[in-house]
């Protein structure tokens, strides 16, 4: 016997037991119902005159004792106290109206905000019902869960990269500002000038042959060479 057969057999036996219990209890239930109706009718017949008499007596006593005293107390109340009571009642009604006018937009806003939540809950309930009916497998549910987890991880990574980029940009900007403050342009020393050799013939740019110099330059070079020869002699 399979599990389904055993469940069906247990369900059938439970159903038979319930039907048998209902058949056994039915006569007692009918008898109890009849007795309850009889007792209720009897109590109503016996208590109705007493209740009516008590109500009449209370009405008479109120008219004879309490009503005159209330009227007398009302006449002895100072006008200022009565006016204050009336003003308090008016203020209470005004405050109630203001509270209603103030709370109505908030309630409407809360209801409007609860709409998407209600729709989401209905969607999830429908999805759960479909899953219970077997139209969605456990594998599909696991895929959805993994998809949501991937989205959450991607969102966290993007937020982390954005924060790191902002921090790095701020640090670079701060470093540039500090470097500019520590080393201003006017404080930077110019590079040293390179020395030009005292003598030597000028050559062409490609170094292939000597360039044709100006006669004055040639005369100056000749004088310098003659002076060097005299010194060496």
Curated annotation (Swiss-Prot):
* GO MF, any single term: DNA binding
Which segments show compositional bias classed as Basic and acidic residues?
A: 217-233
**InterPro entries linked:** DUF5324
Q: Which UniProt keywords are present, listed alphabetically?
A: Antibiotic resistance, DNA-binding, Transcription, Transcription regulation
Which residue stretches belong to region Disordered?
A: 190-233
In this entry, the residue ranges of the DNA-binding region are: 93-112
Q: Please list the GO biological process terms of this entry.
A: response to antibiotic
This molecule's function is given as:
Seems to be involved in the regulation of nhs expression.
Identify this protein by name: Putative nosiheptide resistance regulatory protein
Organism for this UniProt entry: Streptomyces actuosus
